[in-house]
Amino acid sequence: MEIENAVIEEVKKSSRVSVAKPFRLTERDVSLLRFVYEQKFATLELLYFRFFDKRPNASDAVPENMWVTRQRVAVLKRAGLLRSQMVYTESKAIYLLTQLGYQVLKSKRELFHYADPVQQVDFRYFEHDKRISYCRTALERSEKCYLWFPERTLRMQR
């Protein structure tokens, strides 16, 4: 915990990021940050399905505004752990991991490799990457997949 706070303070000083108010980083937040790091980016809908979906049946209606997901992502953005980028083909934002979020993951030893987070989405592969993220979410939710190795990890181990 001390290491994490020290890393956050150091990155805030170096990047001049201001944090509105303190908050507790939960295990779900760390998992969410790791997911965004591994998948390069995530949409609000994808984060809802992966981390916040409490519907008893998959056929039940999805909440219209995904309010809880939206609130938590806003907290992580204010803390400087996530940033948003507009996708003009969908008129929706996607979320990317910031350098501060990456430092938090490194300090918690949550990563299999240590490549810097993606700074810009390559829109040539946007649809492909988004669909892979949905496939991963579906496989993990159905418990058919327990450990996911992203393509970036596999390429770094060659």
Enumerate the predicted regions with their spans:
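Short gly/ser-rich loop at a beta-strand->alpha-helix junction or flexible surface loop bordering the NTP-binding
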Residues: 131-134, 139
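Active-site metal-binding core of divalent-cation-utilizing nuclease and nuclease-like domains
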Residues: 85, 124, 138-158
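A short, highly charged nucleic-acid-interacting micro-segment common to nuclease
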Residues: 116-132
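Sequence-pattern detector for short linear motifs
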Residues: 73-75, 134, 155
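Nuclease-adjacent, charged terminal/linker segments that flank catalytic cores
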Residues: 1-119
